[in-house]
Amino acid sequence: MNRERYLQEIDAVNAAGKYHPTWESLSTHPVPDWYREKRLGIFLHWGVFSVPAYHDWYARNMYIKGSPEYEYHCQHYGQPKDFGFKDFIPQFKMEAFDPQAWVKLFREAGADYIVPVAEHHDGFQNYRSELSHWNAAEMGPHRDIMGDLLVEAERAGMTLGASSHRVEHWWFLGHGQEFDSDIKQPMHLGDYAWPAMPERENQDLFSEPMPTDEFLTDWLLRLSLIHISEPTRLGMIS
């Protein structure tokens, strides 16, 4: 992906569009019919963290010394400096993943839409991406999870959504820098743990340190996952 060209395209679309980068403007955007009218949807929270099968914040908490996750990790996998969260990726094989069977089950349950987590706070993308090699198409299962589900959802007449939790990656692995672990400086854009900033007690719009322009630009570019739907439908829930 040509990052600069894609950013220019985003700016051009924004300039020509009816919405502006303000809460007042964005609040006028109507809720999509598929989300407003459908009675039941299935939300899927699944990823590399499913390998240790502890919970979805395992990647953060295993780097907090004294936490139950840290103790569990050391007991079962060793010290984080020797076996970090990224080392679970080769074990995320998804041998039994059958998107057709999944969608059939969801449809039989009465669901009309499916919303998987396309990227969790841990930074691993469950879709093919040109922005990072840390994605399911290139590592782990070597499958485009979102793309595979999209094909089957469209075939069944269902809408597929995408939930992106990338913004919290800013600090999600930051505790790993507090002791000798596999998360250490220097880190750069494209590295798995980057930027691993210190976590503050209050995560709000005014928390310091604020995300850098480099991080926010990368976050914006990752919303390009909306294009995996072309020419079909993908509902974006970020």
PLM regions with names:
Residues 226-238:
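Residue-level detector of conserved catalytic or cofactor/ligand-binding positions
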Residues 3-9, 80, 173-225:
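Formylglycine-dependent
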Residues 161-163:
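Structural detector of well-ordered beta-strand residues that form the stable sheet scaffold
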Residues 2-124:
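N-terminal structural segment of carbohydrate-active enzymes
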Residues 107, 121-159:
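Aromatic-lined substrate-binding rim segments of carbohydrate-active enzymes
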Residues 38, 98-105, 109-110, 145, ...:
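Alpha-helical packing segments of well-folded alpha/beta enzyme cores
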Residues 48, 52-68, 125-141, 166-204:
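Aromatic- and acidic-residue-enriched segments that line the glycan-binding/catalytic groove
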Residues 13-21, 81-98, 128-144, 202-218, ...:
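The substrate-binding groove and active-site-proximal loops of carbohydrate-active enzymes
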